[in-house]
Amino acid sequence: MKEQTPIRKAVALHYDEQKDKAPRVIATGKGHVADNIIKEAKKAGVPIQEDRTLVELMRHLTVDDQIPEALYETVAEIFSFIYKLDESVKNKK
């Protein structure tokens, strides 16, 4: 029996601390749409974090939805890591 390749899924988040109470979904998709989300993020220099479990927890969200409170801590840790990485790269230039 041939093993099936899992369908790729992606969720893109944005957080504007001046406007948003929590990070919100700006794009979501699976298959080719997910591939395009990832491709555009890479092209724009947006950091990508692969986490299948987190994507599964967010799969029911739609564009402009804020993430549920239960995910605040996990997403905050990811955003913090990305921010620190970004600052580290800027300081090396």
From Swiss-Prot:
GO terms for cellular component: membrane. InterPro entries: T3SS_FlhB-rel, T3SS_substrate_exporter, T3SS_substrate_exporter_C. It comes from the Bacteria. One of its GO terms (biological process) is protein secretion. This is Uncharacterized protein YlqH. It comes from Bacillus subtilis (strain 168).
